[in-house]
């Protein structure tokens, strides 16, 4: 009988392979707008067992992001996310949380979004590297947008140390976003965006690491021609800097 780790590795590999047929390639673009941006992220995951042994399966997620557009010169978005998780095993956990996003458009008032999210998080250490799969469902309450938008996000991450027991590692990940319903004024059911990242990670210790690299963000921004199914697209070239804490 195959070992449990081998089975988990196969499941995660199949999950990742399913992203190869990305939805973005199936959508013809009418126009493409590009920008260089800077995203900063701090994410902390705390295990509550250190406070009370009876809470050893419970987790807390705290995250803060700052995003800057126009070559990184102007604030674009601020995001705060918090959640509570429960460990089903050493490699699987389920989560429920809330996020608030403030968007700062040019020549317009700040737009606010309140978001409820649920996710399943899977991790595995394979012989060829570390794998992470995150499936997240969101209910987005966006100012001046109706009805509530439902969105599915699938994230797959791979990392591998540059040499045995090295603190420095190669990090690759991809995340696909799909709208599960249509909303007004212009968001339609289907592909929303894709984010792909390539960079380096450095582990200061088992509890802290930083990841720096290039993220490509492809966004289907609005409908141009419903008859021809054409859309405006935006491509953002992003310098991504993230700090992760395991407490």
Regions found by a protein language model. Name each.
Residues 41-43, 81, 117-119, 155-157, ...:
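Membrane-embedded beta-strand positions in outer-membrane beta-barrel channels/transporters
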Residues 46-48, 86, 122-124, 160-162, ...:
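Residue-level signature of outer-membrane beta-barrel architecture
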Residues 31-39, 68-77, 107-111, 142-148, ...:
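Solvent-exposed loop/turn segments connecting transmembrane beta-strands
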Residues 51-60, 91-96, 127-131, 165-169, ...:
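Repeated loop/turn-to-beta-strand initiation elements of outer-membrane beta-barrel proteins
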Residues 120, 233-247:
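Outer-membrane beta-barrel "beta-signal"
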Residues 130, 134-225, 245-247:
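Outer-membrane beta-barrel transmembrane domain signature
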Residues 24-28:
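N-terminal signal peptide c-region/cleavage motif recognized by signal peptidases
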């Amino acid at each position: 009988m195959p070992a449990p780790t081998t089975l988990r590795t196969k499941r995660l590999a199949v999950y990742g392979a399913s992203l190869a047929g990305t939805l973005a390639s199936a959508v013809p673009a009418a126009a493409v707008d590009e920008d260089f941006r800077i995203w900063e992220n701090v994410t902390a995951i705390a295990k509550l067992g250190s406070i009370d042994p009876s809470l050893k399966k419970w987790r807390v997620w705290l995250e803060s992001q700052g995003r800057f557009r126009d070559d990184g010169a102007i604030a674009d978005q601020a995001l705060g996310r918090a959640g509570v998780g429960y460990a089903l095993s050493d490699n699987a956990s389920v989560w429920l949380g809330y996020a608030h996003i403030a968007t700062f458009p040019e020549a317009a008032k700040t737009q606010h979004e309140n978001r409820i999210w649920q996710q399943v998080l899977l991790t595995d250490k394979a012989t060829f590297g570390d794998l992470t799969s995150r499936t997240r469902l969101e209910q987005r309450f966006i100012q001046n947008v109706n009805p509530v938008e439902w969105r599915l996000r699938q994230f797959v991450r791979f990392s591998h140390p540059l040499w045995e027991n090295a603190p420095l590692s190669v990090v690759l990940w991809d995340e696909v976003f799909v709208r599960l319903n249509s909303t007004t004024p212009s968001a339609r059911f289907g592909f929303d965006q894709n984010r792909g990242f390539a960079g380096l990670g450095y582990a200061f210790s088992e509890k802290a690491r930083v990841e720096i690299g290039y993220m490509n963000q492809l966004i289907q921004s609005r409908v141009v021609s419903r008859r021809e199914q054409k859309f405006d697209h935006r491509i953002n070239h992003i310098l991504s800097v993230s700090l992760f804490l395991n407490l």
